[in-house]
């Protein structure tokens, strides 16, 4: 709610943040693009009711047309239907992996930032250990070892989803932990925190009421970066054949299937690669805009 100072209404912090975000034209445009993609993958299959696994060899490798706006693959399957279905999975993996990374990283960073001595040192040693590990070989190894047991336990699609989200999120929390720890180390010495501590407020309430809310800006920005990184990681795993099963058309899997037909059916790879490119680019620009909006010192 606007505050009146000296007879002049001052915008609320949320309004000021929105005004700074609107100045970042690429971030605003990227928000519109990402929102359009989310609406398309969420509601598109309800309007475009072509089954994703319908095979029509008479229409194989067709280019874009009225009946198949994105063309078809080598089995004559409609690429628009498969892109809409796969977009749900790719974006869901990105968002879920981001939540895992944010929750784990924020928890570890908060404990390290509030603790002293051996606890802080041990958690930072653990963070440095994970940062030193080569992520891609370990991703491949973990998925190779645990994919089949999880498939048998909860089914091929959900089991693969859980495994990929856990693995990607498990290798993205370290940067968040370091960022949160630095914020906590800075904020815990501020006057308003010292005043609350002097009034007898417990450490848990200090964190939840004062320190964590003032650290949300950098955490949100880190979350947007993690979404983009998770989408790329899932697409990479699917392209290498270690992601979802072949009958589940994620964007990375569609790109993998298109690699042998680049010369005769370039539209196949173009739409899959374009979906990944637009999603990742939009999220990165949104992250830039949020960084400038949430931290006025970085905005020009």
Each predicted region: which residue ranges?
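Gly/Trp-centered helix-boundary motif
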Residues: 1-106, 110-111, 118, 132, ...
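Generic hydrophobic transmembrane alpha-helix motif, especially the helices
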Residues: 69, 79, 103-104, 113-114, ...
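Amphipathic cytosolic juxtamembrane alpha-helices at the membrane-cytosol interface
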Residues: 77-92, 96, 112, 116-124, ...
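Residue-level hotspots within pore-lining transmembrane alpha-helices
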Residues: 88, 130, 134, 171-174, ...
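Short alpha-helical transmembrane interface motifs in multi-pass membrane proteins
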Residues: 89-93, 108, 124, 162-166, ...
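Hydrophobic alpha-helical interface/terminus motif in multipass membrane transporters
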Residues: 111-112, 142, 146, 180, ...
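Helix-loop interface residues and adjacent transmembrane-helix termini in multi-pass membrane transporters
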Residues: 114-118, 158, 224, 239, ...
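Non-cytoplasmic
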Residues: 137-141, 145, 165, 169, ...
